[in-house]
């Protein structure tokens, strides 16, 4: 099964090949994309409003990403030019984790998805490439401040078989 892991990987491959804007099914945009996107944007990274008292307090905080001040980079939204080196790095990191998968190392169920194809390898790969200073990117601390909305759907329907409910 692990449809969420497959979806993660497919999303990275498609966005690498085609570029553009990806939003999760439950997400939306409150403004025209023209007001978000700038011609010079190659890759946009967004963080969570996850500090004490904020809307998504605690979201994206993961023991494997403690070195990132605000936790994981969001991958419910991906904005990239085609053949983005950032997405190439993500694909390589996820491929490595799939090829070397171990339930002991990466876990199973929800944790397995987060650690193998989800925000953990996504954030690790993106952060690693940021530190090379070779490629440009734009960082938006909060996605919602520039129009991206995390939950804009009835999540009881969308999440009926959500990967977070998987135990094996």
Say what each PLM segment does.
Residues 8-20:
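Small-residue hinge/turn detector
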Residues 1-8, 23-168:
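Glycosyltransferase-associated regions of secretory-pathway enzymes
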């Amino acid at each position: 099964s692990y449809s969420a892991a497959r979806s993660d990987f497919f999303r990275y491959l498609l966005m690498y090949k085609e570029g553009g804007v990806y939003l999760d099914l439950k997400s939306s945009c409150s403004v025209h994309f023209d007001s978000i996107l700038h011609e010079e944007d190659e890759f946009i990274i967004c963080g969570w409003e996850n500090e004490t008292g904020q809307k998504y307090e605690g979201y994206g905080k993961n023991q494997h990403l403690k070195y990132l001040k605000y936790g994981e980079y969001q991958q419910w939204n991906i904005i990239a030019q085609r053949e983005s080196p950032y997405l190439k790095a993500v694909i390589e990191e996820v491929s490595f984790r799939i090829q070397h998968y171990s339930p002991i190392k990466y876990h199973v169920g929800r944790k397995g998805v987060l650690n193998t194809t989800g925000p953990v390898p996504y954030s690790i790969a993106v952060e690693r490439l940021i530190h090379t200073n070779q490629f440009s990117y734009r960082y938006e601390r909060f996605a919602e401040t520039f129009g991206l909305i995390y939950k804009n759907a009835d999540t009881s329907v969308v999440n009926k078989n959500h990967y977070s409910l998987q135990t094996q």
